[in-house]
Amino acid sequence: MGKYFGTDGFRGEANVTLTVDHAFKVGRFLGWYYGKNHEDGKAKIVIGKDTRRSSYMFEYSLVAGLTASGANAYLLHVTTTPSVSYVARTEDFDCGIMISASHNPFYDNGIKLINAAGEKMKEDVIAEIEKYLDGELGEIPYATRENIGCTVDYTAGRNRYMGYLMSLAIYSFKGIRVGLDASNGSAWTLAKAVFDALGAKTYVINAAPDGTNINANCGSTHIEGLQDLVRREHLDVGFAFDGDADRCLCVDEKGEVITGDHILYIYGCYMKDRDKLVGNKVVTTVMSNFGLYKAFDAVGIEYEKTKVGDKYVYECMSENGYRIGGEQSGHIIFSKYATTGDGIITALKMMEVMLAKKKTLSELAAPLVIYPQVLKNIRVTDKTQAQDDADVKAAVEAVANALGTDGRILVRESGTEPVVRVMVEAGSTEECEKYVDQVIDVIKSKGYAV
């Protein structure tokens, strides 16, 4: 990770951490950098945004920077992150930009950069952007006269993406009662239209964005509202998205939450049954629940574990040709259909499995028993030193031995804070608490705690 850009873009509080000046300079750099690949100097860059009040401000700043460097800016307007990825990789765009802070509160925002292949932008390009932001590359010339770039309203690109989503459904949804929680974010422009077109009877909540209510007690991080809707209206299934709709969690017909781990299990089994699970493997992160691995073992599915972050999941998948991978949080990547997590594709694929198997979501998820989990953070003076301490390691090993094959312990550093995270999964919450506290007590006793 760099000074400005992390694994999921440049993110922070609008006009505090991420300012309009930053956005303008990012636009200036990208317009100039990609313009060098064109005889006429005109790069072609597509932009999407979520519903935050500041997203419009950052869009204007990016467009000003891009066009001032001679690039043409194509505006999808309010749309999802995966739609920007799709448009970038299926048309002749040099790159894509998504303005969003995903599941963060409205006062945060972010700039996600996507290359022409629809993937997260390569680190060497990000490094050059950071140099420019820090004034290390000198001045970029301004375009003048007819060389100034154009701005194009490009809702046609978003509509084409909607058509692509509909083409992925191999069954009619007629007669199925579906709840959708749009999180007052990007999904509100797409999800209902797609499900309606496929024949579902849709019940939608949190689809009235006002610039400040994105992710506010709604969506995939606050799924209780969707659970209530499914139970109250006796729906067959529900899907909750985050602010930019690259995540999706589900609610079964009983109103119970279906996590990303459940989704990986359900779709992994579906693919294996059809001899389409490449390498017989599903890609997970180290934070996936212990119960997922036990369930995979029971059906003979193998798995790869990556660091936390859909970036690392995608890298593992692309290097090995794997078809399905993701995170407990609902970032699920179906590599045959997308290069990023795509919440709406996730929902469509869960519908496909239900219809193909003629089973409810609760029936499909039943073999996976989620273990109780306790995760605690402890602020420390030196997170690497604390984690590498011999006594701390001994305490972790003692817990691992005590749990045996009936649980696990994971201790890892935060990537962004001076924090060590201690997580235990075991047969009961009480057992988890006991073992987490044992390790934290050792960290405190060695003087690392702040």
From Swiss-Prot:
Chain positions found as Phosphoserine: 102
One Gene Ontology term of the molecular function aspect: phosphoglucosamine mutase activity
PTMs per UniProt: Activated by phosphorylation.
Annotated residues for binding of Mg(2+): 102, 242, 244, 246
The protein's enzyme class: isomerase
Domain of life: Bacteria
NCBIfam families reported in the protein's UniProt record: glmM
Function, as annotated: Catalyzes the conversion of glucosamine-6-phosphate to glucosamine-1-phosphate.
Cited HAMAP family: GlmM_B
Name of the protein in question: Phosphoglucosamine mutase
